[in-house]
Amino acid sequence: DARLSSFLSADKNADDSDRDAFLSGQMIDLQGRLNVANLIDGNAISESGMAGFSRLFATLGLPSAELTTMAAQLLRASQNSNPPTNQGPTQPLTDGVPDPLMPERVSELLWLGLTPDSLNALSPHITLLPTRTPVNLNTASAEVIHAITPGLEMADAQKLVSARQRSPFSALTDAAQISAGRPGQFNESLHSVSSRFFEVRGSLRLDQTTLQERSLVQRDGQTVRTLWRHRGVIADSRGTAP
């Protein structure tokens, strides 16, 4: 954290008796996580996406039924948000269950059938991006690398994490040489060594209250776009969530 007063020291009217406020910031590589959007491919559930998430659920000891429900609900939400142009208006549902809304953030996956406990376990390992993305082997955890790579043992995933700390991968062939897995184990549809999507977090803390702003940004070459931004108080003066 940095004191806000350090940025305002040139202000002759600054009052030293004022309470200290602190600024902090963080950038997270979201392509170091499994992307929930990969569960859908066009107008169907993705076989490779389900395989990766199934391995992650198994590693974390989570019920596979929740994954099945989440994928089905995500497909339903996607179809409702982007109905085929040749089918006309969406027809009313006959099962009495309203269409789920299309989530924008990981916290909103509760809408699709995840329990709070499962969401808490998954949150460090997953993201929700507007398009399908490969996993960046330079920033993903061993759990994510193991999940996204068919046939890769957890020990080999941990070996990759250790190797990149000494020398980041510049190509997928670098990872293949270390893992010594089967040919084609690392491919551009599932893996990468660079990223386009990041979350930028900024916080302002005063006493026990923290105001946090989170933004999803997309970088393409020298062009950076903000796709969404959310701001809110994450703790009150009693140290509890608002």
PLM region descriptions:
Residues 1-242:
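Compositionally biased linear targeting/interaction segments
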